[in-house]
Each structure stands twice: as structure tokens, then as C-alpha cells.
């Protein structure tokens, strides 16, 4: 809704239009889900849930991609956990639409208010040095601010000199976090295909977002996915395995309970539990170092490695994820 003398962003009449659409859809097409794609700071984003029953059913979780990226880049989960611990939904009829990458870049505005501007700029600089492209906006005072990083999520998480084994481990770690969060996860086609930065596409098409929009011939991509020596094969098959595991365990259902905390600055714990009292614990080591963590009364089997967890001390290898049940 546009109105002279205002920013034309998030005006009350915008919300009234959504309420009207929701009322119509609920009557003529019950069961239809409304999702809002608002790439803005978190507090403005969640406003589109309305009262929990009168606007969007799902909201894109735009803060998740840059926060997971920040956690892996800094090898520190504290900012991610601090934000996630405050996630609340207005009703049981709403949930999050979680993602890490899309056909657009990684938005930085959803980080504002969650991280100091100095840390955002530090992240941007580090990614630029590794080959990411950045879109900027001009401020009224003549300065510029970055608003979007253009890069595949694979290359955002790793460095140029990283081995494919490390690239895959970091990438699977990030997507295991995505799959563990409350809500509905979505995985971009370029991500599950293990795509790298497409600089030729940027040069050909003339815009930064082309870096993560490569088009493939079916035979070409099928050949690479079937070649066990390729990064694509490793990413596709390991990520597909995690998705299959997730679908097999009810604890991950969007309506089920969620808690998150830090074991230390590099290890995050996510617990999901259902109405029957069953609990699944995810442990995520975002560092390049082995982490030894002591957790009492955590026994079960790691669904990913298929190893039984018997003692209180658990060893997590660099970038390792465990789903313990």
C-alpha cells in the first residue's frame, strides 16, 4: 500500500488487505496456506502473522540464512541461539517457512537489530574476499550499506582453499540445522545439487544474482550426480539421506516442541519432542576443532552415524551433527 508522506512499508492498510484476502480464502478455499515473503528486519517480518488467525499462516524465516552463515563463519553459535530462543508463534495455526538459500541473494536487512553493524560489515568483507558479490543501497547521507550477498550457499560457507570433504561437511551441517528448526524446511534446487558460484552466468547476464541461478542440461547434471567422485554426488546423497531421516521421525513435525541452547560457544543443542513424550536431541559442532561435551542423561542412538551413545561424554568431530534418539 502506497501513501504519500510515508515510507509505504508495513502500513496498516497493507495488513488490512492481507486480512481481507485471508477471510476470502478461508471461505472459498479452506485449507489453503498463505505465506508471506517479506525480506525485512525480523520484528517487521513476524508482524505478518497478524493475530495468529487473520493474516499469513507461514512467514519466510529470513533471519535464518545469514545467522547460520554467521555461526559457521565465526565458529560461534551464540548469536544464532540467542535469536532462536526468542522465537514464538502467535497461534498453533501458524509456523515458520525455513530456508537457507533461494534464487535471490542472502539478505542482510534481517540481521539488523540482531547483530551489531560492525559484525555485519565484517561478514560481508570476509565473503567478498572469498569471491561473493554484494548488492549495496545508497543512503541519504551519501554512504552505502550492503543489503544482499550474492553467492551460492556452498561457497558462502567455505573458503577457496577448502577441500571438497570440508565443503560438504560444512554444507550438511548448515542444512541439518535447517532441518532441525521448528517449521517447514525448504531447500533450494542449487543447494541440493551442490552448485558453486556461476561467474560465467553473472558475466553473461549482467547481474549479481545470476551467480546462484545456473541452468543445467539434464544429462550433464545426471552424470555428475551419479559420479561418486564429485562434490555434487556427496552433497545430493547425504542431504537426501538427512531429509529421509527427518521424514521418518515425528519429533520434527512443525507443531512439536522446540528448545535450543548452547553447550559451548561452538556447539548448539536443539531438542524436539512430541506429545507422546518422545525426544530427539540434535548436537551441532560449527567449529573446525574436535569438541568433547559432557551431557548427563543423554542416551540413545545417533540416527546419522548409527552409533549408540552410552556415556555422558560425547565427542563431536569438526562440523559434525548428531541426531540422538
Predicted regions and their residues:
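Active-site and adjacent substrate-binding regions of carbohydrate-active enzymes
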Residues: 1-299, 305-325
Amino acid at each position: 500500500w502506497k501513501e504519500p508522506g510515508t515510507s509505504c512499508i508495513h502500513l496498516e492498510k497493507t495488513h488490512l488487505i492481507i486480512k481481507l484476502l485471508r477471510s476470502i480464502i478461508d471461505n472459498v478455499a479452506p485449507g489453503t496456506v498463505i505465506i508471506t515473503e517479506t525480506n525485512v528486519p525480523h520484528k517487521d517480518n513476524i508482524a505478518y502473522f497478524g493475530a495468529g488467525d487473520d493474516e499469513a499462516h507461514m512467514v519466510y524465516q529470513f533471519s535464518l540464512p545469514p545467522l547460520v552463515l554467521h555461526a559457521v563463519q565465526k565458529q560461534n553459535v551464540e548469536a544464532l541461539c540467542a535469536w532462536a530462543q526468542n522465537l514464538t508463534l502467535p497461534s498453533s495455526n501458524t509456523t515458520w517457512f525455513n530456508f537457507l538459500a533461494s534464487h535471490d541473494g542472502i539478505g542482510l536487512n534481517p540481521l539488523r537489530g540482531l547483530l551489531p553493524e560492525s559484525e555485519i560489515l565484517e561478514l560481508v568483507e570476509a565473503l567478498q574476499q572469498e569471491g561473493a558479490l554484494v548488492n549495496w543501497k545508497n543512503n541519504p547521507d551519501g554512504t552505502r550499506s550492503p543489503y544482499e550477498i550474492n553467492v551460492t550457499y556452498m561457497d558462502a560457507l567455505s573458503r577457496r582453499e577448502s577441500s571438497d570433504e570440508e565443503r560438504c561437511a560444512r554444507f550438511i551441517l548448515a542444512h541439518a540445522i535447517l532441518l532441525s528448526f521448528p517449521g517447514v524446511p525448504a531447500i533450494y534446487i542449487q543447494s541440493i545439487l551442490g552448485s558453486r558460484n556461476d561467474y560465467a552466468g553473472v558475466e553473461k547476464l549482467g547481474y549479481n544474482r545470476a551467480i546462484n541461478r545456473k541452468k543445467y542440461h539434464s544429462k550433464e547434471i545426471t552424470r555428475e550426480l551419479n559420479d561418486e567422485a564429485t562434490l555434487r554426488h556427496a552433497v545430493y546423497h547425504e542431504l537426501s539421506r538427512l531429509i529421509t531421516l527427518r521424514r521418518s521421525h515425528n519429533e520434527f513435525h512443525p507443531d512439536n516442541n522446540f528448545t535450543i541452547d548452547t553447550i559451548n560457544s561452538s556447539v548448539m543443542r536443539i531438542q524436539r519432542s512430541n506429545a507422546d513424550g518422545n525426544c530427539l536431541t540434535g548436537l551441532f559442532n560449527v567449529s573446525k576443532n574436535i569438541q568433547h561435551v559432557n551431557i548427563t542423561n543423554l542416551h540413545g542412538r545417533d540416527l546419522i552415524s548409527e552409533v549408540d551413545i552410552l556415556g555422558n561424554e560425547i565427542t563431536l568431530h569438526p562440523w559434525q551433527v548428531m541426531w540422538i534418539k
